[in-house]
Amino acid sequence: MTDDQTRRSAGASRRRFGARRKVCAFCADKIRVVDYKDVKRLQRCMSERGKILPRRRTGVCARHQRSLTVAIKRARHMALLPFVAAHMHS
């Protein structure tokens, strides 16, 4: 076997067992606009420290990621979500 064949076969086996593509949770539930009052749904897209998780981590599409960011910032401003985690500022 040559080096090219081993590289190709190793790459193919890695791709075959790769992680599945995540489906946007908002598109699956047919939600057009992300509501800032839906705190439970917003918290799923935030880290334990209160940061907004990136798309590659949550699997949200680009359109919903933009509206999710606005909704989280709006919920923070309305004091529905914390800016920082509770254990961080104590």
Curated annotation (Swiss-Prot):
Domain of life: Bacteria
InterPro entries assigned: Ribosomal_bS18, Ribosomal_bS18_sf
Annotated transmembrane regions: none
GO molecular function, one term: small ribosomal subunit rRNA binding
One GO BP: translation
A single GO cellular-component term on record: cytosolic small ribosomal subunit
Assigned keywords, A-Z: Ribonucleoprotein, Ribosomal protein, RNA-binding, rRNA-binding
Function: Binds as a heterodimer with protein bS6 to the central domain of the 16S rRNA, where it helps stabilize the platform of the 30S subunit.
Family assignment from sequence similarity: Belongs to the bacterial ribosomal protein bS18 family.
Subunit organization: Part of the 30S ribosomal subunit. Forms a tight heterodimer with protein bS6.
Cited HAMAP family: Ribosomal_bS18 (MF_00270)
Name used for this protein in its record: Small ribosomal subunit protein bS18A
Name of the encoding gene: rpsR1
